[in-house]
C-alpha cells in the first residue's frame, strides 16, 4: 500500500517541484522494487483532486474535469493523475497487479500541529476556546470520510478490487459545505464563526474546485 504523499496545501504552494517528483518517483520506485521482489499486488492511494473542476455532477470514477496545467497549484492533481497512469502502464507492460483508491477528504483524531487542512484548523480553534476562523466564504461542498472507515475501505480495495481499476472512498451521509462544518464545530464549543483574510501562501495552496462530491 503506497500512501506516502505530502497533502499539505501550504507545501503545494511553496514546493510544487518536490510535490511532482515525490508523487511520480515514489510510485515508480515502489513498483519497480515490487516487481523485482515478487510483489503480489500494489495499491496506490491517489486523491479525488484527480477529478479536476466539477461541472456539477457527482464524481464517478470515470469523470475527468479540467485541471489548469499552467498553475503551480496543479502540481498535486496533475502528478496524482500521472501516477495513476504510471500504475496502469506498469500493469499493461509488466503485468503488475495494481489497484487505485481515491479517498475523499479524510478526518480523524490524529493530526500534526502544523496541519493546515480546514478541519484541522477548525478543531485547533475549538480546543483553544477560540472562534472558528474561516478564510473563504465556505461555499465549497465536499465529501468527507472518517479515517477508520477510509482505512477499512483501502484494505477492502486491496483484497477485492479489480486490477487496473480506481475506486472512490466516501460516505454519502457526510457531504457538507465548509461553512456548515465551521458552524457545527462552533456550536459544539459555544463560539462563533469569524472571517479572516488569508495570506498569499495560503491562497496559492487552496483547491480551486468548489464542489467535490463522490459517488459511492
Predicted features along the sequence, with ranges:
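A conserved pocket-lining segment of Rossmann-fold NAD(P)-dependent short-chain dehydrogenase/reductase
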Residues: 12-13, 65-71, 98-110, 121-145, ...
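Generic structural signal for alpha-helix termini and adjacent loop/cap motifs
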Residues: 6, 15, 33, 37, ...
Amino acid at each position: 500500500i503506497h500512501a506516502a504523499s505530502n497533502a499539505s496545501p501550504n507545501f503545494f504552494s511553496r514546493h510544487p517541484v518536490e510535490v511532482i517528483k515525490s508523487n511520480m518517483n515514489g510510485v515508480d520506485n515502489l513498483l519497480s522494487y515490487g516487481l523485482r521482489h515478487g510483489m503480489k499486488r500494489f495499491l496506490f492511494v491517489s486523491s479525488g483532486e484527480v477529478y479536476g473542476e466539477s461541472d456539477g455532477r457527482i464524481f464517478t470514477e470515470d469523470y475527468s474535469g479540467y485541471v489548469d496545467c499552467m498553475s503551480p497549484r496543479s502540481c498535486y492533481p496533475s502528478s496524482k493523475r500521472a501516477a495513476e497512469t504510471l500504475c496502469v502502464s506498469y500493469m499493461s507492460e509488466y503485468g503488475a497487479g495494481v489497484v487505485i483508491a481515491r479517498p475523499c477528504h479524510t478526518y480523524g483524531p490524529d493530526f500534526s500541529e502544523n496541519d493546515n487542512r480546514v478541519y484541522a484548523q477548525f478543531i485547533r480553534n475549538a480546543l483553544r476556546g477560540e472562534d472558528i476562523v474561516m478564510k473563504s466564504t465556505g461555499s465549497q461542498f465536499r465529501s468527507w470520510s472518517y479515517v477508520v472507515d477510509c482505512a477499512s475501505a483501502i484494505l477492502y480495495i486491496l483484497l477485492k478490487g479489480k486490477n487496473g481499476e480506481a475506486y472512490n472512498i466516501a460516505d454519502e451521509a457526510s457531504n457538507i459545505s465548509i461553512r456548515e462544518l465551521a458552524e457545527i464545530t462552533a456550536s459544539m464549543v459555544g463560539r462563533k464563526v469569524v472571517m479572516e483574510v488569508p495570506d498569499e501562501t495560503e491562497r496559492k495552496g487552496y483547491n480551486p474546485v468548489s464542489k467535490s462530491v463522490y459517488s459511492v
